[in-house]
Amino acid sequence: MATPLVRKPAVPSRTARAGAGPAPPRRVSLSLLLPALCAVLLVSLVCGAGIGASGLSWSEVLRCLWAGLTGGRIAPDQVPAYTIVWELRFPRAVLAAVVGAGLSAIGVAVQAMVRNALADPFVLGISSGAAVGANAVLIFGAFGTLGIWALSTASFLSALLAMMLVYAIARTARGLTPLRLVLTGTAMYYGFSAVTTFMVFAAERGEAARSAMMWMLGSLGGADWASVPIAAGAVLGGLAHLAWSARRLNALAMGDETAAALGVDAGRLRKELFLVSAAVTGAVVAVSGAIGFVGLMVPHAVRMLVGADHRRLLAVAPLVGAVLLIWVDILSRVVLAPAELPVGVLTAVIGVPCFVLLMRRRSYTFGGA
């Protein structure tokens, strides 16, 4: 009986394998990445409290942090160190983490909302609207009766007014469309920026104009414990809503028709995302100024690590953004000590080359492939 011939499967040639395209990149396991990022965040917070021009020892820094966290007593000779660590540096590090987390998460949401790889939290024009209120306080003394709350209150109120204006112009009978949102937000950005620039040039030269310019470039120099709860509450609320909407974000990122086929109301979801993004951006910008590039760069970098699934993106991006902004703020304090650089300047200096390197990678696409 003849033995049947079994044809061996052909082995693809090297040329054929090369022409098949790059293999999909490996994704980092969240079970390893999340604990590592949490540990790095804690270390970064301690470093943010310990690094500065005053030259405190690490034992003093840890002692002051422990006293502040537990409510313990400190020796009279340690009061200056305690003031520096607990009242000045540590709230600043915490606020940097909150702002970085908020900008990164909203960057992910806005890019999905408008399906544009160049979108960031400021594309909606909210930050430039907040700058109008901030400059009114810094230059002209508006809301002076509110004391320390004047700057954040005026910034947040003007951000809300900007949000309402953008929404009113961009909205149509079909709801909010990505193109109208981007175009309206961009137009409002330039319009509000022109107003703030005019306010700075109309002001008398001096400390007020300098403070306004620092705020417009982003600064955490005015951070204190009073400014943390409002920003943290807005960011945590926004993160909770985005995490709950992660599956719908995956559908929206594939297009309105695909989202509708999957049972997702794209118009309603886009409206929710707009309101959440505007509220979080307004709260964050009110306490930190306009810190750019974090909400643009971090989402793209995280996509390369964990892919385009928004459930993974929204778990990792806030932690990466928090760590990034803590260390950028540390650099802003020590590069030209005792002078201080605007945080937004350093985020651009660091972000531009990093972003260019990301875009140079052949395997990277906006969808995370």
Placement of each model-derived feature along the sequence:
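Alpha-helical transmembrane segments in inner-membrane proteins
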Residues: 2-369
